[in-house]
Amino acid sequence: MVQIEKVFGREIIDSRGNPAVEVDITLVGGYFGRAACPSGASTGTHEAIEKRDGDFRFFGKGVKKAVEAINTDIRKSLLGMDSTDQPAVDNQLISLDGTDNKGHLGANAILPVSMAVARAASQALQVPLYEHLADRTYLLPVPYMNILNGGAHANWQGADFQEYMIAPVGAPDFPEAVRWGCEVYHTLKAILKKRGLSTGVGDEGGFAPKVSSNRAPLDFITEAIEMAGYKPGKDISLALDPASSEFYSDGVYELKSEGKKLSSEEMTGYYEDMVAVYPIISIEDGLSEDDWNGWIAMTKAIGKKVQLVGDDIFVTNTKRISRGISEKAANAVLIKLNQIGTVTETISAVTMARNAGWSSMISHRSGETVDSFIADLTVSLGTGQIKTGAPCRGERVEKYNQLMRIHEELGSRATYAGKKREIRHL
């Protein structure tokens, strides 16, 4: 037992220049953990609540109230607790909040405390964070690199779809996967520049050019893969996150870049046509967060051809994931810690998905910090997939760099997921 001695929260800024919460945890013996909470741009309606001040500071986005809660109520409730008992700490935080959606204290107050405790405990136990949280063989994930941005991440200046990703499934190990991704990223930049398109980057480091259709980015990326010396589909596959809740209204999906208005069935057909032409292995949030019937039909139609990842529809919430499993809506879950609010609840979500034969993908948020917690979490849980942006911008590459450090530390004890990533439905 290593008791929590000090709890301290502060306001910092994230990768978009918005306030975020950072927490320091000190244990008896001087062991220390620090963690920061990210924030999303396209957030699901059913996510845990993020508390903002709503006053004149930072146009209402300040987090002083969340920090105050950490330094008063949360501090008092955690002092003296055993830091190595993560479920007990998290259950104490959940009980203190007393709501289903973290609406009292705010997920942005609770999560960084939960993460910082885990980090401090790993230091006290003198083991790496990924080992402290681990419950299985170590698996280094396939990095899903968002190298071209559209939708809300590019201020709606180009494609309707929010993220176009590459997945180096054919790489022999994680460092090589990162190298392949970087080479494709730089090649894509040269292609866009040659065509007179913008090479400015969006929130997650991907390029954000103005394009005339949702297929154009796939053509650019496929060309970049080939020009970099790799084979599309064999070495490097593609993945999409349309974030379709952002362009869904009154039962209609409006693709403004192409002047189309589609039903759920037509949207599914739209994806099916794409999968037939391009080496797409994963589609996240292909339909809206509350279009359950559409998700069920889409899973039945194309779920054996491609991974269908639920983000906004599940929001890392076991109640919603359980419904999805029962109704066969999707076949994979995106995992974002701040959607649910504690490390323990996050692990429960991954466990539920795994027990149902579903895969999981650990994810960053568009408003990030340099905290690399999710890198360790991905390895410890063996999800085999991580989504943390382009190989650009410090808050993105820190996760990749941490995973390369873990690869180095584990040596032969680790396996790169590659084409054997934890996807059991295919």
From Swiss-Prot:
Cofactor binding mode and count: Binds a second Mg(2+) ion via substrate during catalysis.
Cofactor(s) annotated in UniProt: Mg(2+)
Database matches in Pfam families: Enolase_C, Enolase_N
Keyword field contains Ribosomal protein: no
Chain residues that bind Mg(2+): D241, E284, D311
Keyword Cell inner membrane: no
Gene Ontology cellular component annotations, sorted alphabetically: cell surface; extracellular region; phosphopyruvate hydratase complex
Active site: E204, K336
Compartments it resides in: Cytoplasm; Secreted; Cell surface
Enzyme Commission number(s) from the entry: 4.2.1.11
SMART domains: Enolase_C (SM01192), Enolase_N (SM01193)
Swiss-Prot/TrEMBL GO biological process terms: glycolytic process
Catalytic activity: (2R)-2-phosphoglycerate = phosphoenolpyruvate + H2O
Function noted in UniProt: Catalyzes the reversible conversion of 2-phosphoglycerate (2-PG) into phosphoenolpyruvate (PEP). It is essential for the degradation of carbohydrates via glycolysis.
Protein name, entry field: Enolase 1
Gene behind the chain: eno1
